[in-house]
Amino acid sequence: MSLGVIAAAIAIGLSALGAGIGNGLIVSRTIEGVARQPELKGALQTIMFIGVALVEALPIIGVVIAFIVMNK
């Protein structure tokens, strides 16, 4: 097994771990906000979905970097 494959696995794993933690924090804070101010549910959901989309970009970038590292 080459070092490129190991590096790719580490890149994908760490990016997925970071995204999972980030998504959990975003959703939990959104639920707390809706519990405090139910009238802002729509605005908070919109902001949450934008935040989740930005956090999910991290694993996609990690996969791209992993493919680049594997092919070198």
From Swiss-Prot:
Gene3D superfamilies: F1F0 ATP synthase subunit C. The chain crosses the membrane at residues 1-21, 49-69. GO terms for biological process: proton motive force-driven ATP synthesis. The record marks E56 as: Reversibly protonated during proton transport. The keyword ATP-binding does not apply. PANTHER family: ATP SYNTHASE LIPID-BINDING PROTEIN, MITOCHONDRIAL, ATPASE PROTEIN 9. This is ATP synthase subunit c. It comes from Bacillus cereus (strain ATCC 14579 / DSM 31 / CCUG 7414 / JCM 2152 / NBRC 15305 / NCIMB 9373 / NCTC 2599 / NRRL B-3711). The gene is atpE.
